[in-house]
Amino acid sequence: MKFNIKNGTPEKQRSACVVAGIFEQQKLTPAAEALDKSANGYITGILSRGDMKGKAGATLMLHNVPNSACERVLLVGLGKEQELGDKGYRDAVRAVFKALSDTGAADATLFLLEAPVKNRDLSWKVLQIAVGGLESMYRFDRLKSKVEEAEPKLQKITLGIIKSLTEEEQTASEEALQQGLAVGDGMSLAKDLGNLAPNICTPTYLAEQAMNMAKTYKLKVTVLEQKDMEDLGMGALLAVARGSRQPPKLIALEYWGGAKKGKPVVLVGKGVTFDTGGISLKPAGEMDEMKYDMCGAASVLGTVHAVAKMGLPINVVGIIPATENMPGGNATKPGDVVTSMSGQTIEILNTDAEGRLILCDALAYTERYEPEAVIDIATLTGACVIALGHVASGLLSNDDELARELLDASERAVDRAWRLPLFDEYQEQLKSNFADVANIGGRAAGTITAACFLARFTKKYRWAHLDIAGTAWKSGKEKGATGRPVPLLTQFLISRTTRQPGSTGETGSRKNRRKSKE
């Protein structure tokens, strides 16, 4: 789907559909006013009959609007004008694309940039429309023999704006559009990987996808095999892989777009392509969803894809420890003690606490990059779902400044995160009588003790941990990967390349971007 930004008045747009907003109490936005004036009160006449009241997310499709060059006019409710915030605006965008996908329209012109969203500027709205559009049109049907839903005919979106933009506004808007499209593409990639069946998306498959991306964007990729990990002493990662016939991989994907000797930001994504729990076997119900236990890895690949597509002037390394966690005659047993790459010994009390085992070796491996900062992303604990539900990802960090950067990015991207503590007192729960540390700390504060375990392997750099167990996928009727936290991670990296006040969502200047290879 193609996007562009264009000045003009809505009634003169030769488009299959023009979209305009309506506030509650039937107050028209400037675009709706222009359409209504051209049509001699046609729209206000319809509204006066009660067909639409401007409720947030409501839509009304009109055909043959008098004196309008377009085939259709879609009205979308924006709620109360003084209360329009992030959620209301994003809900309206999704409602628009849902309504458009149900029509035969091949193109549409959206006049939604004029809506006054609290504490957000034009660039933020442009980015949200691009991301929301791609997200709304996403389909995953590649494994079906017959496609149940016809492909949407919508191919072109124009972001219309009545007022003339300054050169600075035009540049910032175009930049935001490219960022939004890159984020949307990165989310789609992460969703595709998460939604694939686990017999397809294996550790080897993830390595192949990284190699394909490296070829496309001329990145450096390294794939460590089991023998390489043995030589490095990655006893924790290999302990998880012992029960599976699928060979484990450790994937390193390097993007060097910043200063030649600049330290990279390293993203470490948990890549358990299927998690049975191992000998500590999970219940059968909903075990199919454990194919999503590699969504941390998927988000790293999606973020690196977005960064490379934008050509950001920053150095980023993605590290993915990938394996299955299966029971078997050679599988790790509860009570086994293994030696991690760092030299620390670990008593494995529960084989279903495997994510932290593969991450601890990946985090130790990360030291060779002398990173500026490290962020690991993992579907790590059910406790995080209990604590934060499916709205916010859990954030824990050994560095306050890094945590603030990530929280700011989460607010700008509307990809929520919430910080939890890493108090030393929680380390008491990880004590073992037989090793340096146990891999679980009991039921209490499960998200925190999991991060406390990881913190033991991150002493040499600034580090943050994102627990995405509640946000990486949806269950039930809408089952599927969400693509989170690609928006948060990408915004975090964008913010590091530009001066970007948190309240306005500014996206910076094009001149700060590295030329993209696409």
UniProtKB/Swiss-Prot annotation:
Q: Where does Mn(2+) 2 bind?
A: K270, D275, D293, E354
Give the protein's biological function. Answer: Presumably involved in the processing and regular turnover of intracellular proteins. Catalyzes the removal of unsubstituted N-terminal amino acids from various peptides.
**TM segment ranges:** none
Q: Does the keyword rRNA-binding apply?
A: no
Write out the biased-composition intervals (Polar residues): 495-507
The protein's required cofactor(s) are namely: Mn(2+)
Instruction: Pull one GO CC term from this UniProt entry.
Output: cytoplasm
The organism's taxonomy opens as: Bacteria, Pseudomonadati, Pseudomonadota, Betaproteobacteria, Nitrosomonadales
Q: Where in the cell is it found?
A: Cytoplasm
Please report which protein family the annotation says this sequence is part of: Belongs to the peptidase M17 family.
Instruction: Indicate the residues that form the catalytic site.
Output: K282, R356
Q: Which UniProt keywords apply?
A: Aminopeptidase, Cytoplasm, Hydrolase, Manganese, Metal-binding, Protease
List the molecular function annotations (GO) for this entry. Answer: manganese ion binding; metalloaminopeptidase activity
Presence of keyword Transmembrane:
no
Chief location bin: cytoplasm
Reaction equations catalysed: Release of an N-terminal amino acid, Xaa-|-Yaa-, in which Xaa is preferably Leu, but may be other amino acids including Pro although not Arg or Lys, and Yaa may be Pro. Amino acid amides and methyl esters are also readily hydrolyzed, but rates on arylamides are exceedingly low; Release of an N-terminal amino acid, preferentially leucine, but not glutamic or aspartic acids
Name of protein? Probable cytosol aminopeptidase
- GO BP: any one term: proteolysis
Task: State a single Pfam family of this protein.
Answer: Peptidase_M17_N
- What enzyme class is recorded for this protein? hydrolase
Q: Which residues bind Mn(2+) 1?
A: D275, D352, E354
Chain spans, region Disordered: 495-518
Q: How is the cofactor bound?
A: Binds 2 manganese ions per subunit.
